Design a protein with these regions (language model features):
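Compositionally biased, charged N-terminal/linker segments
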Residues: 1-43
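Structured loops at beta-to-helix junctions and adjacent beta-edge loops in soluble globular domains
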Residues: 7-9, 50, 102
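Surface-exposed, flexible loop/turn segments at secondary-structure boundaries
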Residues: 11, 55, 71
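Short glycine/proline-enriched turns and hinge-like loops at secondary-structure junctions
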Residues: 17, 42, 57-60, 76
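A general structural signal for short secondary-structure junctions and capping/turn motifs
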Residues: 39-40, 55, 88-91
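Short, charged beta-turn/beta-strand-edge "cap" motif at the junction between a beta-strand
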Residues: 50-57
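Aromatic- and Lys/Arg-enriched surface recognition patch
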Residues: 61-124
Length: 124
């Protein structure tokens, strides 16, 4: 089992949203490195839910990968901010995965705390 770090802005889609829904399609990713990481994910892998663009940013909970190799439908929707005119049904460019809520952490693990307690090599 691998562990991943996945981020979202809490006012856009936070861990409370995921808890209410139970699971979600983690779509709209338009970064090639992140897309390639998602392509490496396996069912049963765990992901830390990181709240970004908030004060303070940090890890707030844990999710599980429950489905992989999903073609991201938002790339085909011209009304979506994630629309990609270069993508086609025959040659999709973006993938996503489905994640299931596992739990909130009792307290936020802040970015500052991560930096203070772990070296980049340890976080690897």
């Amino acid at each position: 089992m691998a562990y991943w770090l996945m981020k979202s802005e809490p006012d856009v889609y936070g861990i409370d949203h995921l808890q209410r829904e139970g699971s979600t399609l983690w779509d709209g990713i338009r970064n090639y490195q992140a897309r390639n990481f998602m392509r490496s994910m396996q069912i049963g892998d765990r992901a830390f839910f990181y709240h970004s663009n908030t004060k303070p940013p940090g890890i707030v909970g844990l999710m599980e990968v429950v489905e992989t190799e999903i073609v991201d439908p938002s790339q085909f929707d011209p009304n979506s901010k994630y629309f990609d005119p270069a993508a086609s049904l025959q040659k999709p460019r973006w993938d996503c995965c489905r994640l299931r809520y596992l739990r909130h952490f009792p307290q936020l693990l802040s970015l500052d705390a991560l930096r203070e307690n772990f070296s980049p090599e340890q976080l690897g």
